[in-house]
Amino acid sequence: MAYTFCPKCGSRLESRAIDGRERPACPRCDFVDYENVKPCVGVLVVDEGKVLLVERGIEPFKGYWDIPGGFLESDEHPADAAKREMLEETGLLVEPVEVLDFWVDAYGDEEFMALNICYVARVVGGEAKAGSDAIRIEWFPLDALPQDIAFNWERPALEKLRDRLRD
């Protein structure tokens, strides 16, 4: 979300060329809105060739299938966020094994971009059940994924996971 007014002094921001890009900047003080990405995690768990997805219960993309995950808290390590989000959304305790990759993608129709850190994790406990902002959870074969995947970054992540497991 871009600022209209300076959060330091209240002046209206103006567009200014800074570091080779047009950025909202304050004409009275040193504030520049760099419009940084928001960090998120996604967690892929595979069991017997099937990956766990959640059906979103909130916007954006309510009713679409989603990789379990969410935004990091300001003081949270991404691996800890992965564990927390999996427990909240699926009831499962997981241990992140590796980072599959990173993707930058728009967060629905919002005016910000998200940096999605996608983990592969293994289940270490809990009971699989939909929680917090999930309507339901389901295990899908990696070769028969649903068409209605929520975010643009998720299909390449699922394809990368599928290709890695084939090798």
PLM region descriptions:
Residues 2, 130-167:
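Nudix hydrolase/Nudix homology domain
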Residues 3, 23:
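Residues immediately within or flanking Cys/His clusters that coordinate Zn2+
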Residues 6-9, 26-29:
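Short cysteine-rich clusters marking metal-coordination/redox-active sites
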Residues 14-15, 34:
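Short functional micro-motifs and their immediate structural scaffolds
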Residues 16-17, 92-101:
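A short coil-to-beta-strand element that immediately follows conserved catalytic motifs
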Residues 28-51:
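Conserved N-terminal beta-strand and adjoining loop/helix that marks the start
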Residues 46-88:
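Conserved Nudix-box catalytic region and its N-terminal flanking loop in Nudix hydrolases
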Residues 103-127:
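Active-site-adjacent beta-strand/loop module that shapes the phosphate/pyrophosphate-binding cleft
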